Amino acid sequence: MTEAQRHQILLEMLAQLGFVTVEKVVERLGISPATARRDINKLDESGKLKKVRNGAEAITQQRPRWTPMNLHQAQNHDEKVRIAKAASQLVNPGESVVINCGSTAFLLGQEMCGKPVQIITNYLPLANYLIDQEHDSVIIMGGQYNKSQSITLSPQGSENSLYAGHWMFTSSKGLTAEGLYKTDMLTAMAEQKMLSVVGKLVVLVDSSKIGERAGMLFSRADQIDMLITGKNANPETLQQLEAQGVSILRV
């Protein structure tokens, strides 16, 4: 296979998935990790994709602005619905929850809406939904608006550390035995500031993300209290996480 052919296939993968890891490229093209990284570097230099740590993103990729009208278009939607329902059942009346951005986060917000629970979020589509539905207690974290993800980010992360919650629900592009990975560094760093002030960290990722490593390490596995994922998740990775004290629920 020529370099041009590899590049074409890699771009087709990105057009379909939006994001690929080096491991996925190696598996799909039957090449070495070094060759995969060279291909990604060349395509990044030519402006055809965006290189991220351990992978690449489609250059035209825009994070969807999730609403009740388009959530059904989310990848692995049915599995994410089950994950959100299971997560909502963890929270008791009167408790507070921190919910971050993404389709699973929006689904969880829908499940929590109307219940006697305080919801803390920096995800504006979810905040707008909760306000429209007249949810009793919504706290919107302050900061600078980030258009690409429809969230607010505190430049120094100082404000985020003031928002303590009983639960923090978050998701990502990858979860391995080492921990949870996020591809957006600014978002990850802002959320990291809150890890020390929340009661429990619960990771919500569909089964396709288990065993994938992409971006920066957001939290070590031993910092994660619970993982809720799909039934098709990589069993080896789940066993490794359980050995480190992570409680796992497959739905």
From Swiss-Prot:
Q: Tell me the ranges covered by the HTH deoR-type domain, including all copies.
A: 3-58
Indicate where this protein resides in the cell.
Answer: Cytoplasm
Transmembrane feature ranges: none
Keyword Transcription regulation belongs to the record: yes
Q: InterPro entries under this entry? A: Carb_Metab_HTH_regulators, DeoR-like_C, DeoR_HTH, NagB/RpiA_transferase-like, Tscrpt_reg_HTH_DeoR_CS, Tscrpt_reg_HTH_UlaR, WH-like_DNA-bd_sf, WH_DNA-bd_sf
- Primary localization: cytoplasm
Taxonomy, superkingdom: Bacteria
Tell me, which GO biological process terms does this entry list?
negative regulation of DNA-templated transcription
Tell me the keywords, alphabetical order: Cytoplasm, DNA-binding, Repressor, Transcription, Transcription regulation
Cellular component GO terms, alphabetical: cytoplasm
Keyword Membrane included in the entry's annotation:
no
Cited Gene3D superfamilies: Winged helix-like DNA-binding domain superfamily/Winged helix DNA-binding domain (1.10.10.10)
GO MF annotation terms: DNA binding; DNA-binding transcription factor activity
DNA-binding interval(s): 20-39
Its function?
Represses ulaG and the ulaABCDEF operon.
The protein's name in its UniProt record: HTH-type transcriptional regulator UlaR
Tell me what organism the protein belongs to: Shigella dysenteriae serotype 1 (strain Sd197)
